[in-house]
C-alpha cells in the first residue's frame, strides 16, 4: 500500500498540496521533514502525531529529517493571544539538546533509511540581516502575511511584534535549506502550521525552482472539542518520565472515551485495519470491558516509556484494586500511582490512627464520617480491611519504609507518607 493511502484511511491527512502528485512521487523513496521548536524541556503528547508521521514514512521506505528549531525556538510561532516569552539562548539550546535525546524512540537513526537530525540554528545564525531581507524577505507579500488568521486576530487585539511576524519567513527558509542540502521534498506538520508550511513550498519554487509538497495532520481534540494532551492536573502530558510519570501517561489514555478511542488508535498506533476493526466491534458491543482503551494505553506507554514501564504501571493498577501485591511495586511507581489521587504527609508526633489518616488524606471529611467508614467495613490500608477505630500503622505496614495506600469503598484511593 502506498504510504499516502495508508495515511488516508487512518484519517491523518488534514490539508495537502497536490496529493496525487505526492502519491506518485512517494512510489519511490523521498526525503521529508518535520520541525519541532524547543519551547519546553521535553516534547509533549501534542507532538506525537506529526512525529509518528516521520516513523510511518520511514517504515514505508522513505528518509526522514527531524529538525530541532534552535533558531526558530528563539522567536516563537505567533499564537492567538499575547507574545511568547523570550527564552535565553542557553535555555533554548539546552531544551533542543534534551528534545533531541527523546527522538530515538520514534524514528530509527540507523539502517538504510536512517533518520537525520538537524538544527536550523546551523544556517539561520550565520545569515546576516541584509542577506535575510534580500534573499528571503523580498519573496513575501505583506498582504499575504497579514491575511494569516493568527496575525489578523493579533492585530485586532493586542498587536504583534515584528519578531513574531517574521517567524513564517524563518520556517519557510528552513524548507529551502533542507531542499538544497538533502533533496527534501515534503514537509509535514500540525494543522496550525499550514500557513507557514505552504510559505516554504512557495519559497522553494521561487528560490530553488523546485516543486515540493506539504501535508498537515489534524489537530487532536477529544469528542468535546477540548485540547488533547492535558494531564489530570491541567498541565501538558510530557514525554519525559520525570515530568509526567509512566503511570499518569497510562491513565490518560486508559480514560479515553468510547467516542475518541478508535480515532486515537488510528492516529497514534501502528495497529492494522483488521485489528482496529475488531476493537471497534468491542467498543460497540462490549464497551464496559474497555478493551480498546486498555490496548491504547498499553501501546502508547510501550511507545514512549518501553515495555518494562508498561508492565510496572499495569501491575500498579491491579495492586490498587487488590488484584496484585502492593509490596511488589517499586517505590517510584507506587508514589506515582497514589500521587494521581491525593497524598497526605504525616509528620513525627502527629496523630496517625485510621480515623486521622482518612481525614488527613481527604477520604473522609470528618472524624464522624471516618468512623462510619470503618464501622461499615469500607476502610482499607494496603488492601487490608481495617476494623478498629484506633488502628495505627506499625513499621512493617509501611511500604518502602514510609508509604500507606488508603482506600475507602471500592474506588476512592489516597496515599499517606509517614515522614517520621
UniProtKB/Swiss-Prot annotation:
CDD domains, alphabetized: TyrRS_core
Domain of life assignment: Bacteria
PROSITE patterns on file: AA_TRNA_LIGASE_I, S4
EC numbers, comma separated: 6.1.1.1
Residues making up the signal peptide according to the UniProt record: none
Catalytic reaction equation(s): tRNA(Tyr) + L-tyrosine + ATP = L-tyrosyl-tRNA(Tyr) + AMP + diphosphate + H(+)
Annotated motif 'HIGH' region, positions: 38-47
Subcellular location: Cytoplasm
Positions occupied by motif 'KMSKS' region: 227-231
Cellular component, GO, one term: cytosol
Keywords of the record: Aminoacyl-tRNA synthetase, ATP-binding, Cytoplasm, Ligase, Nucleotide-binding, Protein biosynthesis, RNA-binding
Enzyme class: ligase
Alphabetical list of NCBIfam families matching this protein: tyrS
Oligomeric and partner information: Homodimer.
Protein known as: Tyrosine--tRNA ligase
Lineage: Bacteria, Bacillati, Actinomycetota, Actinomycetes, Mycobacteriales
Originating gene: tyrS
